[in-house]
From Swiss-Prot:
InterPro entries: Ribosomal_bS21, Ribosomal_bS21_CS, Ribosomal_bS21_sf. The keyword Glycoprotein does not apply. This is Small ribosomal subunit protein bS21. Keywords: Ribonucleoprotein, Ribosomal protein. GO terms for biological process: translation. One of its GO terms (cellular component) is ribonucleoprotein complex. The lineage of its organism: Bacteria, Bacillati, Bacillota, Bacilli, Lactobacillales. GO terms for molecular function: structural constituent of ribosome. It comes from Latilactobacillus sakei subsp. sakei (strain 23K) (Lactobacillus sakei subsp. sakei). The keyword Ribonucleoprotein applies. Belongs to the bacterial ribosomal protein bS21 family.
Amino acid sequence: MGKTVVRSNESLDDALRRFKRSVSKAGTIQEYRKREFYEKPSVKRKLKSEAARKRKKF
């Protein structure tokens, strides 16, 4: 999880923006959404092969 310390003379909006950026760079939100629901191993393999096929197409 991202950690942000509010600097002196920094608005809360700026600190929140820095926090959101750090969380985004760390991939926390994407990881949460990926693990929100259980995926069977067969479904994971299917999605992985579809993603590879899509990458190869372009």
